[in-house]
Structures are given as structure tokens and as C-alpha cells.
Amino acid sequence: MGKKYTESVKLVDKNTLYTVQEAIELVTKTSKAKFDETVELAVRLGVDPRHADQQVRGAVVLPHGTGKTVRVLVFAKGDKVNEAQEAGADFVGAEELVEKIQKENWFDFDVVVATPDMMGVVGRLGRVLGPKGLMPNPKSGTVTFDVAKAIADIKAGKVEYRVDKTAIIHVPIGKASFGEGKLSDNFHVLMEAVVKAKPAAAKGQYIKSVAISSTMGPGIKINPGKVLE
């Protein structure tokens, strides 16, 4: 891997701010691993995440998905159980799933959806789901009675974005095998969503820096002033 990484690094100039198109072209060239690498976007924002009014979070359906099979766990009861199963949920349940997670440390799922009437039950898992970014949230559309739509969106390639403590958002935008066109489409849809999510309390330059990289490849910096072009 060392040799391949060294070759990849030579293709990228650390001091250059590339256009989106140049960066995406480079990321496909620097993806040299034997597996289909994930391409990740990192955006540093001009917000202070310590303040509640400067949080940036949301969700968006990427036009070409992420290339990843997403396992969905749904907390529901009554007729919502059937609705979730028919919509393609991988796991559906209530109290018994809470116990399974608590007792067996079971996490064979990627996204959790819950109906609002189940949040009292799901709340008991806050300490284990929260740190993993798995807690259902109305802002990201994962606390809803419309479980069929929530599942369909997730399976279609919906990704959540959320600013971390260092004011950076990390989101996958697809696989290296997608090629430049699909990665570019996904990049622009995601960046537009992040720009629209700018909090009113955020002052000064909002998009501070942008970079993309493949799983094993080097970071490629993008000119933050040209991300929507």
C-alpha cells in the first residue's frame, strides 16, 4: 500500500486549490486500492458548534446514492410494523430490540428510524446510540410516522450531515467506481444542502475549506469560493 499511496500523493499538489472538476478527476486517479474505495467530502465551516444556534445538520438524498448497502432498523408498533417490513426495513421491533442492543451490544445496522410514539422507548438507548450517530432525529427525517418514505429515502442514498466539534462535516459522496459524472452530481447536491443549512447566527466566511479523498488516497483541496460552480 505504501508504494501506491506515494504514487497517489505525487499526483496531488498540496498547495493547490483545485476546481471541483479537477479534484474529482484526481480522486478517481488516486484511488488505487484493490477494493472500491469510498470518496469522502470534508467541509470546514465558519461556525462555532458549541453554540446551539450554530449547529449545522440535515439530510439529503444523493442522486446516485452512496454505493453502500444500508441496513435500516425501525422502532415501530401496530400497523407501522407491517409498513416498515413492506418498505424494506432490515429489522423492525420495539422493546425486544432495545434489550438486544443493551444486552448483546448488537449494532448490525447503519441507520435507525423510529415513529414518534416510540421515542420514549428509544430514548433509553441514547447513551449507546448517540455517540455512534445513530439516534433518530426529526431534523434528519428519522423520527416520523411515514416510515415507508423514510426507508425509501435511506435505501435510495440519503446521507446525514452534521458538523462535528471541530466545525467539520464528513460525508461519503459515493464510490471511486462511480466515475466523474456521478461523483460530481452527488458533490453538488450535498454542497448546495450544506450552504442552504447556514445558520443565521454564523458570521463571516461560511465555507472555510473543502477537500475530498478516497479511503486510502491523499486529501485534495478544493477552492471554497468555487464549490457551487
UniProtKB/Swiss-Prot annotation:
Pfam families according to UniProt: Ribosomal_L1
Domain of life: Bacteria
Keyword Transcription: no
CDD domains registered for this protein in UniProt: Ribosomal_L1 (cd00403)
Single GO term (MF): rRNA binding
BP GO annotations: regulation of translation; translation
Annotated GO CC locations: large ribosomal subunit
Entry keyword set: Repressor, Ribonucleoprotein, Ribosomal protein, RNA-binding, rRNA-binding, Translation regulation, tRNA-binding
Keyword DNA repair found: no
InterPro entries from the UniProt entry: Ribosom_uL1_bac-type, Ribosomal_uL1, Ribosomal_uL1-like, Ribosomal_uL1/biogenesis, Ribosomal_uL1_3-a/b-sand, Ribosomal_uL1_CS
Subunit structure: Part of the 50S ribosomal subunit.
Function field: Binds directly to 23S rRNA. The L1 stalk is quite mobile in the ribosome, and is involved in E site tRNA release. Protein L1 is also a translational repressor protein, it controls the translation of the L11 operon by binding to its mRNA.
Family according to the record: Belongs to the universal ribosomal protein uL1 family.
HAMAP family: Ribosomal_uL1_B (MF_01318_B)
The name this protein goes by in its record: Large ribosomal subunit protein uL1
Organism: Clostridium botulinum (strain 657 / Type Ba4)
Encoding gene (name): rplA
